């Protein structure tokens, strides 16, 4: 859901949507580390299961694991959710196509894991999301919906 708030592709935005986009940073906190760590662990487990059961990896799982580490590190470092993988796109596609040797992909994963953990230790994000501000937005949105102020 957070990725939707940071998507560079927006067709149209209502006034309510503009208000939500204006407070999107309120959703970011150090809890990103816990959330992304869970996603990374899940992808790593899938990768290990593939190796154990089939003797090979599903490259899509490897690519997603690395993409998650890149995204999580960017959020913790810059305080902004980066949806576009930009400069890493070709390298990620090389992994997805199975064209990168597993050892090289795994070395990148390990390097990114170290960076991710360092970014967590150094992040300036708050401990928790700004629940009060988000709740105030939600209450206002519901009030406006009930009074038919919304399109």
PLM-predicted stretches and their roles:
Residues 8-144:
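Conserved nucleotidyltransferase catalytic core and NTase-mimicking acidic/glycine-rich helix/loop elements
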